[in-house]
């Protein structure tokens, strides 16, 4: 999946967790209550089951990743509210 510059997911969780493999570009990830982290090709990011988070590109660079998650009772993700511009810029 590729995120164009400035694009990001909404806040969300995964019932069995999620692994991101960053393959190109430069991105940002944030766990609820944590700092925004920058990610680069070769980085592997793990989000624990139920951990609220978002991920996307930086403001100026696209980011591509492979996302791996499993389903629990037919559901792989629980989408929540959009990430505000203020949250994204932190």
Short names for language-model regions:
Residues 1-14, 49:
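Conserved short histidine dyad/triad with adjacent acidic residue
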Residues 9-14, 31, 37-38, 56-57:
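Short histidine-centered beta-strand/loop micro-motifs
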Residues 15-28, 32-33:
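Glycine- and acidic-residue-biased ligand/ion/polar-headgroup-sensing regions
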Residues 33-50:
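Short acidic-glycine-tyrosine-enriched beta hairpin
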Residues 54-90:
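Double-stranded beta-helix
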